[in-house]
Amino acid sequence: VITSETGTRTIMLTRMLTVRVFPFLGEMQGVDGLLSGDMNFYSPYYRQCSLETFTKDRYVAKRMPVAVRDVKNAFRFYLAKINRDRPFILAGFSQGAMIMLELLQEMDVDTYRRMVAAYAIGVSIPEETVTRCPRIVAAQGAADQGVTVCYNSVRDASCALWDKSAVVINPVNWRTDTTSALLVTEPTPRLPVKEQQKDTMVVHLDVESGLLFVDGYSATDYVLPLIGREGNYHSREIWLYRDALRENMALRAAEFLRGR
């Protein structure tokens, strides 16, 4: 029990203890919100690589196999002990998306038939990977099944972090052409939403670069250390589109169940 002369200190101490005991509590609450409370989710611990890893190829070669092995083992456990032959959605962001692609490349036919969709967010999927892996099927709309959703958001093409992705879709209007879509949302997850003015942004897919061009974004606190770049919105790929992603997961799941 923590006592204090002021409620503010008690709250601050409670938050500090919560962060130390449950370091990923905020992230898991965010995932729970993304799933609308209508789906269960399985999010195992794994030995995640630091941002420093991606500054040198030799670091990636040495460290990523450890993370990949952890997630593969966790997915096998999920299928054997938890899933019970039910439909499922795969979702990963950045490093998690890279590893998720490894799961797709090894997935057997029976498991794939139960996969509603895969969301590989904030990663590039090369053409040769798509050609090699029949389980990676590019999403073409809002409700297709067994597909992979992928996108990367930037101010313009010069801000890209990765090479062109062969799989890309606009998560606001769920189109793969250049049709623009209006996105209105709070610009940053670092402040309470009630304290923010919403940005009105225009999002369109640039077919030549395979990137989402975002006009009208006001935040300045998005640049990642070590690997980030001004005008690249990698750290906000889920935050900006969270409402669209939530609705889309629910739609794809409903369509999948309707077709069974």
Which sequence ranges carry the predicted segments?
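Gly/Ala-rich beta-loop-alpha elbow adjacent to hydrolase catalytic centers
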Residues: 90-100
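An acidic- and aromatic-residue-enriched active-site/binding cleft used to recognize and process polar
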Residues: 46-49, 93-95, 120-124
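Structural recognition of the beta-strand scaffold that forms the well-ordered cores
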Residues: 1-2, 40-45, 89-90, 117-120, ...
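Short, well-ordered amphipathic alpha-helices
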Residues: 28, 99-106
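Surface cap/lid and interfacial helix-loop subdomains adjacent to catalytic sites
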Residues: 70-84, 105-255, 259-260
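Extracytoplasmic/secreted cell-surface and envelope-processing proteins
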Residues: 10-12, 53, 98-100, 127-131, ...
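Active-site catalytic motif of lipid deacylating hydrolases and related acyltransferases
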Residues: 2-86, 219-260
